[in-house]
C-alpha cells in the first residue's frame, strides 16, 4: 500500500522525526495509521499516533474503532506489511518486527479481511 504520509513527507524528514520521537519516548511506538485503498470505513482524524509499547494490537484495535465511530456489527481489520497481525501481539513487538527505515510502524485499516480489496 502507498501510504499518503510517505507521499507528502520526504524520507529525510520522516527519518529525522522518527529518530527524535524514539529518542524522546523510548518506551513508546510511533505509528502511521491510514485507511487501506477501497476500504469503506471512515477516515481517522489524524494519521500519527504514539502508543505505549506494551499496548496490544487488540487494545489498539478498540481505540481505533472508537475513533472512527464504528458500530459493533461493523468489521475492521489491521494490516502490517500486508498481513493481519495477531491481536495478542504488543505494539512494541510489531514495531521491532516491522518498522520501516524511517523508524515508523505503518498500519493500514480496512473493513475487508483481504488486503487491497
Swiss-Prot record:
Prodomain positions: 117
Organism of origin: Homo sapiens (Human)
Top-rank taxon, per record: Eukaryota
Tissue distribution: Ubiquitous. Expressed at very high levels in the brain, heart, peripheral blood leukocytes, liver, kidney, placenta and skeletal muscle. Expressed at very low levels in thymus and small intestine.
GO molecular function: GABA receptor binding; phosphatidylethanolamine binding; ubiquitin protein ligase binding
Chief location category: cytoplasm
Official protein name in the record: Gamma-aminobutyric acid receptor-associated protein-like 3
Residues covalently joined to lipid (Phosphatidylethanolamine amidated glycine): 116
Gene Ontology BP terms: autophagosome assembly; autophagosome maturation; cellular response to nitrogen starvation; mitophagy
Entry-linked Pfam families: ATG8
Cellular compartments annotated: Cytoplasm, Cytoskeleton; Cytoplasmic vesicle, Autophagosome membrane
